[in-house]
């Protein structure tokens, strides 16, 4: 199971929504579960990492997510998610500008100022004022300019990615003010802690959905790969129902 890949699971939850690719369209674009070699040259390595992630999820991550879900009330969990989203604003804003989207950049900036002023980011009054949340990263920016994803990758713990998006993670670090405000060790500690908390929060909201995808798929690896690719394309195109991801 790939914990830190929200787009995969949330896409599956919304796969019946209007606008998402049908199974036939997905097969035409990405191939069926058995047509994997041509678009997944690192499949053997990816499957090994996928199995590692599944084992880690069963042993550690899922139990932590269940505990987090059951221990804290929804308002607390919502505040945690809002705060983490607010921290990611500089990265989102930079990529809004790089993609040439001033309207989305305006929404992002407004969200940051409103939510920071009224609750230090723990609440989300900006959404009620017409500034909904959206997620952007440099991988999406590259994709918006036609850069292909390159080889599909499954990263340890982080889950589905690609050569393009993995490189994008590095660039996004330079957009994050914490990279410059904290020392090297402090920045790494904060980054890891923030990513882990965001992942646990996401996993806690999708426990049953994750279980159902794994149980109902003949080949969970191929299923997750297909879902991730479809959702990633929707994120790049800024379509409705796109899902934030920890990329």
Residue positions per predicted region:
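N-terminal targeting leaders of membrane proteins
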Residues: 2-85, 89-99, 187, 191-247
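A short secondary-structure junction signal
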Residues: 165-169
């Amino acid at each position: 199971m790939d914990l830190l890949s929200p787009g995969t699971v949330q896409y599956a939850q919304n796969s019946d929504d209007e606008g998402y690719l049908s199974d036939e369209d997905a097969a035409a674009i990405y191939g069926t579960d058995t047509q994997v070699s041509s678009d997944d040259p690192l499949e053997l390595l990816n499957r090994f990492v996928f199995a590692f992630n599944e084992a880690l999820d069963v042993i550690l991550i899922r139990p932590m997510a269940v505990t987090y879900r059951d221990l804290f009330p929804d308002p607390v969990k919502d505040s945690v998610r809002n705060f983490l989203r607010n921290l990611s604003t500089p990265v989102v804003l930079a990529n809004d500008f790089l993609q040439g989207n001033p309207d989305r950049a305006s929404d992002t900036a407004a969200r940051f100022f409103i939510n920071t002023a009224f609750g230090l980011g723990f609440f989300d009054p900006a959404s009620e004022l017409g500034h909904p949340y959206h997620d952007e990263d440099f991988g999406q920016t590259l994709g918006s300019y036609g850069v292909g994803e390159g080889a599909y990758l499954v990263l340890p713990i982080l889950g589905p990615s690609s050569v393009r998006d993995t490189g994008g993670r590095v660039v996004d670090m330079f957009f994050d003010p914490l990279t410059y405000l904290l020392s090297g060790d402090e920045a790494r500690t904060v980054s890891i802690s923030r990513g882990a908390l965001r992942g646990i929060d996401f996993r806690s909201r999708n426990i049953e959905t994750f279980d159902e995808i794994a149980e109902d798929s003949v080949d969970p690896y191929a299923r997750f790969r297909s879902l991730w690719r479809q959702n990633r394309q929707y994120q790049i195109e800024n379509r409705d129902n796109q899902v934030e991801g920890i990329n």
